[in-house]
Protein backbone atom coordinates (compact mmCIF):
# COMPACT_ATOMS: atom_id res chain seq x y z
CA UNK A 1 0.00 0.00 0.00
CA UNK A 2 1.18 3.52 -0.75
CA UNK A 3 0.20 5.08 2.58
CA UNK A 4 3.19 5.60 4.91
CA UNK A 5 2.83 3.80 8.21
CA UNK A 6 2.71 5.75 11.48
CA UNK A 7 4.67 2.86 13.01
CA UNK A 8 6.25 -0.20 11.40
CA UNK A 9 8.25 -2.66 13.51
CA UNK A 10 8.34 -6.44 13.89
CA UNK A 11 5.27 -7.22 11.74
CA UNK A 12 3.35 -4.59 13.73
CA UNK A 13 2.05 -1.75 11.56
CA UNK A 14 -0.07 1.27 12.51
CA UNK A 15 -1.90 3.66 10.21
CA UNK A 16 -3.21 7.08 11.23
CA UNK A 17 -6.41 8.45 9.73
CA UNK A 18 -9.98 7.66 8.73
CA UNK A 19 -10.44 3.90 8.72
CA UNK A 20 -12.85 3.87 5.76
CA UNK A 21 -10.40 5.80 3.58
CA UNK A 22 -7.37 3.79 4.70
CA UNK A 23 -9.09 0.43 4.24
CA UNK A 24 -9.35 1.29 0.54
CA UNK A 25 -5.54 1.45 0.36
CA UNK A 26 -5.01 -2.06 1.73
CA UNK A 27 -4.55 -4.83 -0.83
CA UNK A 28 -7.84 -6.66 -1.53
CA UNK A 29 -8.16 -10.12 0.07
CA UNK A 30 -4.85 -9.72 1.94
CA UNK A 31 -6.24 -10.02 5.50
CA UNK A 32 -6.77 -13.36 7.26
CA UNK A 33 -8.82 -12.10 10.22
CA UNK A 34 -10.41 -8.85 11.36
CA UNK A 35 -11.31 -7.87 14.90
CA UNK A 36 -13.33 -4.66 15.21
CA UNK A 37 -14.60 -2.79 18.24
CA UNK A 38 -16.30 0.16 16.50
CA UNK A 39 -17.67 3.27 18.21
CA UNK A 40 -20.87 2.68 20.17
CA UNK A 41 -21.87 6.36 19.82
CA UNK A 42 -22.78 6.56 23.49
CA UNK A 43 -21.07 9.72 24.70
CA UNK A 44 -23.38 12.28 26.25
CA UNK A 45 -23.83 13.92 29.61
CA UNK A 46 -24.24 10.75 31.67
CA UNK A 47 -22.05 9.28 34.38
CA UNK A 48 -20.97 5.78 35.35
CA UNK A 49 -18.92 4.04 38.01
CA UNK A 50 -15.33 3.07 37.22
CA UNK A 51 -12.78 1.91 39.77
CA UNK A 52 -15.11 2.94 42.57
CA UNK A 53 -15.35 6.51 41.26
CA UNK A 54 -18.07 8.42 39.43
CA UNK A 55 -16.83 9.30 35.94
CA UNK A 56 -18.28 10.89 32.80
CA UNK A 57 -19.28 8.68 29.90
CA UNK A 58 -17.97 11.26 27.43
CA UNK A 59 -15.23 9.34 25.60
CA UNK A 60 -14.49 11.92 22.93
CA UNK A 61 -15.79 13.37 19.68
CA UNK A 62 -15.31 10.00 17.96
CA UNK A 63 -18.06 8.48 20.17
CA UNK A 64 -20.61 11.32 20.16
CA UNK A 65 -24.26 10.31 19.77
CA UNK A 66 -25.61 9.99 16.24
CA UNK A 67 -28.99 9.25 14.72
CA UNK A 68 -30.01 5.67 13.98
CA UNK A 69 -29.63 6.32 10.26
CA UNK A 70 -26.16 7.84 10.68
CA UNK A 71 -24.98 4.90 12.79
CA UNK A 72 -26.31 2.35 10.31
CA UNK A 73 -24.73 4.12 7.33
CA UNK A 74 -21.40 4.29 9.15
CA UNK A 75 -21.53 0.56 9.93
CA UNK A 76 -22.39 -0.24 6.32
CA UNK A 77 -19.43 1.77 4.99
CA UNK A 78 -16.72 0.31 7.20
CA UNK A 79 -18.00 -3.28 7.04
CA UNK A 80 -18.18 -3.09 3.24
CA UNK A 81 -14.58 -1.81 3.18
CA UNK A 82 -13.50 -4.63 5.50
CA UNK A 83 -15.09 -7.25 3.26
CA UNK A 84 -12.95 -6.04 0.37
CA UNK A 85 -9.65 -6.62 2.21
CA UNK A 86 -10.66 -9.91 3.89
CA UNK A 87 -9.64 -13.05 2.02
CA UNK A 88 -12.36 -15.51 1.07
CA UNK A 89 -11.46 -17.93 3.88
CA UNK A 90 -11.06 -15.18 6.48
CA UNK A 91 -13.42 -14.21 9.28
CA UNK A 92 -14.45 -11.02 11.04
CA UNK A 93 -15.24 -10.52 14.74
CA UNK A 94 -17.20 -7.44 15.82
CA UNK A 95 -17.79 -6.42 19.42
CA UNK A 96 -20.74 -4.29 20.46
CA UNK A 97 -23.62 -3.65 22.82
CA UNK A 98 -27.36 -3.10 22.40
CA UNK A 99 -26.52 0.40 21.16
CA UNK A 100 -24.97 -0.78 17.89
CA UNK A 101 -24.92 -4.57 17.57
CA UNK A 102 -28.35 -4.93 15.93
CA UNK A 103 -27.32 -2.56 13.15
CA UNK A 104 -24.04 -4.43 12.76
CA UNK A 105 -25.75 -7.82 12.51
CA UNK A 106 -28.12 -6.51 9.86
CA UNK A 107 -25.29 -4.91 7.87
CA UNK A 108 -23.26 -8.13 7.94
CA UNK A 109 -26.11 -10.00 6.28
CA UNK A 110 -26.82 -7.14 3.85
CA UNK A 111 -23.16 -7.11 2.78
CA UNK A 112 -22.93 -10.84 2.12
CA UNK A 113 -21.61 -12.29 5.37
CA UNK A 114 -22.83 -15.38 7.21
CA UNK A 115 -22.86 -15.08 11.01
CA UNK A 116 -21.17 -18.11 12.56
CA UNK A 117 -21.64 -17.37 16.23
CA UNK A 118 -23.19 -14.82 18.56
CA UNK A 119 -20.69 -14.77 21.43
CA UNK A 120 -21.82 -13.39 24.78
CA UNK A 121 -18.93 -11.90 26.73
CA UNK A 122 -19.93 -12.08 30.40
CA UNK A 123 -17.92 -9.66 32.54
CA UNK A 124 -17.10 -11.13 35.93
CA UNK A 125 -16.64 -7.72 37.57
CA UNK A 126 -18.96 -5.23 35.80
CA UNK A 127 -19.44 -1.72 37.20
CA UNK A 128 -22.61 -1.31 39.29
CA UNK A 129 -25.76 0.30 37.92
CA UNK A 130 -25.86 3.60 39.80
CA UNK A 131 -29.36 4.56 38.61
CA UNK A 132 -30.93 1.41 40.14
CA UNK A 133 -33.59 1.56 37.41
CA UNK A 134 -32.34 -1.24 35.12
CA UNK A 135 -30.40 -4.49 35.41
CA UNK A 136 -26.61 -4.26 35.64
CA UNK A 137 -25.04 -4.17 32.17
CA UNK A 138 -22.69 -7.14 32.49
CA UNK A 139 -22.37 -8.47 28.93
CA UNK A 140 -21.28 -7.49 25.45
CA UNK A 141 -21.97 -9.29 22.19
CA UNK A 142 -19.29 -10.40 19.74
CA UNK A 143 -20.48 -11.46 16.29
CA UNK A 144 -18.23 -13.86 14.37
CA UNK A 145 -18.87 -14.04 10.62
CA UNK A 146 -17.46 -15.27 7.33
CA UNK A 147 -18.16 -14.42 3.70
CA UNK A 148 -21.37 -16.12 2.57
CA UNK A 149 -19.89 -17.81 -0.48
CA UNK A 150 -19.80 -21.53 -1.25
CA UNK A 151 -16.02 -21.76 -1.58
CA UNK A 152 -15.32 -20.08 1.77
CA UNK A 153 -13.65 -22.45 4.24
CA UNK A 154 -13.23 -20.51 7.44
CA UNK A 155 -10.60 -21.40 10.02
CA UNK A 156 -11.72 -22.68 13.43
CA UNK A 157 -9.11 -24.20 15.73
CA UNK A 158 -11.56 -26.51 17.47
CA UNK A 159 -8.98 -28.59 19.33
CA UNK A 160 -7.21 -25.50 20.68
CA UNK A 161 -10.47 -24.15 22.06
CA UNK A 162 -11.38 -27.51 23.56
CA UNK A 163 -7.99 -27.71 25.28
CA UNK A 164 -8.49 -24.23 26.74
CA UNK A 165 -11.83 -25.38 28.14
CA UNK A 166 -10.72 -28.41 30.18
CA UNK A 167 -11.09 -30.70 27.16
CA UNK A 168 -14.77 -29.81 26.72
CA UNK A 169 -16.44 -28.15 23.75
CA UNK A 170 -16.30 -24.40 24.22
CA UNK A 171 -19.69 -22.71 24.42
CA UNK A 172 -20.68 -19.28 23.13
CA UNK A 173 -20.79 -17.64 26.57
CA UNK A 174 -17.32 -16.48 27.61
CA UNK A 175 -16.58 -15.32 31.13
CA UNK A 176 -13.60 -13.03 31.74
CA UNK A 177 -12.75 -10.12 33.98
CA UNK A 178 -12.59 -6.56 32.73
CA UNK A 179 -9.22 -5.17 31.62
CA UNK A 180 -6.66 -5.55 34.40
CA UNK A 181 -4.88 -2.47 35.84
CA UNK A 182 -1.55 -3.99 34.73
CA UNK A 183 -2.74 -3.73 31.11
CA UNK A 184 -3.21 0.03 31.55
CA UNK A 185 0.20 0.91 32.98
CA UNK A 186 1.19 2.73 29.77
CA UNK A 187 -2.12 4.63 29.65
CA UNK A 188 -5.69 3.60 28.99
CA UNK A 189 -8.48 3.76 26.45
CA UNK A 190 -12.12 4.15 27.58
CA UNK A 191 -13.26 0.96 25.84
CA UNK A 192 -10.08 -1.12 26.21
CA UNK A 193 -10.66 -4.85 25.84
CA UNK A 194 -8.84 -7.39 28.06
CA UNK A 195 -5.90 -9.35 26.69
CA UNK A 196 -7.57 -12.62 27.71
CA UNK A 197 -10.52 -11.94 25.41
CA UNK A 198 -8.37 -11.21 22.36
CA UNK A 199 -6.16 -14.22 23.03
CA UNK A 200 -9.17 -16.51 22.73
CA UNK A 201 -10.43 -14.84 19.56
CA UNK A 202 -7.05 -14.93 17.84
CA UNK A 203 -6.25 -18.50 18.86
CA UNK A 204 -9.69 -19.64 17.69
CA UNK A 205 -9.52 -18.29 14.17
CA UNK A 206 -5.91 -17.79 13.04
CA UNK A 207 -2.58 -19.58 12.73
CA UNK A 208 0.95 -18.28 13.22
CA UNK A 209 2.05 -15.74 10.56
CA UNK A 210 -1.55 -14.90 9.63
CA UNK A 211 -2.27 -11.20 9.06
CA UNK A 212 -4.76 -9.62 11.46
CA UNK A 213 -6.43 -6.22 10.99
CA UNK A 214 -8.10 -3.99 13.57
CA UNK A 215 -9.81 -1.04 11.85
CA UNK A 216 -10.40 0.66 15.24
CA UNK A 217 -7.03 0.08 16.89
CA UNK A 218 -7.74 1.96 20.13
CA UNK A 219 -5.04 1.10 22.67
CA UNK A 220 -3.70 -1.69 20.46
CA UNK A 221 -4.74 -4.76 22.44
CA UNK A 222 -5.43 -6.73 19.25
CA UNK A 223 -1.94 -5.99 17.97
CA UNK A 224 -0.23 -6.69 21.29
CA UNK A 225 -1.85 -10.12 21.45
CA UNK A 226 -1.27 -10.80 17.74
CA UNK A 227 2.48 -10.22 18.12
CA UNK A 228 2.60 -12.26 21.33
CA UNK A 229 1.06 -15.18 19.41
CA UNK A 230 3.35 -14.73 16.36
CA UNK A 231 0.75 -13.18 14.07
CA UNK A 232 1.22 -10.13 11.85
CA UNK A 233 -0.80 -6.99 12.55
CA UNK A 234 -2.16 -3.83 10.95
CA UNK A 235 -4.05 -1.33 13.11
CA UNK A 236 -5.90 1.78 11.97
CA UNK A 237 -6.63 4.62 14.38
CA UNK A 238 -7.94 8.18 13.97
CA UNK A 239 -6.66 9.53 17.30
CA UNK A 240 -2.89 10.07 17.57
CA UNK A 241 -2.95 9.83 21.36
CA UNK A 242 -4.11 6.22 21.10
CA UNK A 243 -1.54 5.38 18.44
CA UNK A 244 1.15 6.72 20.76
CA UNK A 245 -0.33 4.68 23.62
CA UNK A 246 -0.20 1.59 21.42
CA UNK A 247 3.46 2.20 20.64
CA UNK A 248 4.28 2.60 24.33
CA UNK A 249 2.54 -0.70 25.06
CA UNK A 250 4.32 -2.43 22.16
CA UNK A 251 7.73 -1.20 23.27
CA UNK A 252 7.24 -1.63 27.01
CA UNK A 253 8.62 -4.56 28.93
CA UNK A 254 6.14 -7.41 28.75
CA UNK A 255 4.21 -5.81 25.84
CA UNK A 256 1.14 -4.89 27.92
In which residue ranges do the predicted regions lie?
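Core catalytic lobe of class I
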Residues: 1-245, 255
Amino acid sequence: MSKKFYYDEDNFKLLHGDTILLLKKIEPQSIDMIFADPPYFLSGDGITCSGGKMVSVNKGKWDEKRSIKEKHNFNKRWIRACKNVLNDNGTIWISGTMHNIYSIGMVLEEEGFKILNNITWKKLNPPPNISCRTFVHSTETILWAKKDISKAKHKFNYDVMKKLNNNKQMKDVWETSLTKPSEKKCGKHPTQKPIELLERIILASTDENDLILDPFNGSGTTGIVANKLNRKYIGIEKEKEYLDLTIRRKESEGNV
